[in-house]
Amino acid sequence: MKYVIIGHGGHSKVIKDLIESREGHMIIAYLDDKYELLDTIMDVYIGPVHSIRLILNQHPDVKVVIAIGDNKTRKAIVEELNLPPEYYSPLISENAVISPSAQIDIGTVIMPGAIINAEASIGKHVIVNTGAIVDHDCRIGDYAHVSPRGCLTGDVTLQEGVLIGTGATVIPGLSIGTWSKVGAGATVVKSIPNYC
């Protein structure tokens, strides 16, 4: 499987490790607007994001991963690219624990040590970061991010774009509203409205 990585910063380093840990998987391009021109370095394309069309014309069988940690930027890039869904798939670490009854949508990345338990549902282009826990019956909206060691106990709902900070915990049955943020180390004991 060939991959194009959108974003060439810190998050892309972990994505690179996930991809290259699998036999037969390889990265053919890193696209980031910090680059002005499309070039190749050791047979890997390096260039601006708009170069994606040229690469897809030459390699129509690739998968695209948005390696951007910031939720709003990740959503903006997905909307700007406007690619058909078949170019995206979940990228799941072999060192994650995933319940067979969990549902994980396209473009979502599950990092090493993450645990996704029974009947959890995870939307599009979500990051479940290193060692995060998404327990039974949780629902995570598109473009959310559960940071390293974040913990969603049972039946928690995250709406679109929510950020759960490093080591934060949300107790059972709560809802975190659209584009809200939970700070690192927090324990959430009541639901949070949108845009907080």
Model-derived regions, located:
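Short amphipathic alpha-helical segments
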Residues: K16-L18, A76-E80, I122, P193-N194
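NAD(P)-binding Rossmann-fold cofactor-contacting core
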Residues: R22-T40
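Residues at the starts of beta-strands that form the adenosine-phosphate
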Residues: K2, M26-I28, K63, Y87
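Glycine-rich adenosine-cofactor-binding loop
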Residues: K2-D17
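Phosphate-bearing ligand-interacting subdomains
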Residues: E36-V97
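Short alpha-helical
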Residues: G10, K72-T73, T187
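Structural signal for interior beta-strand "rungs" in well-ordered beta-sheet cores
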Residues: P90-C196
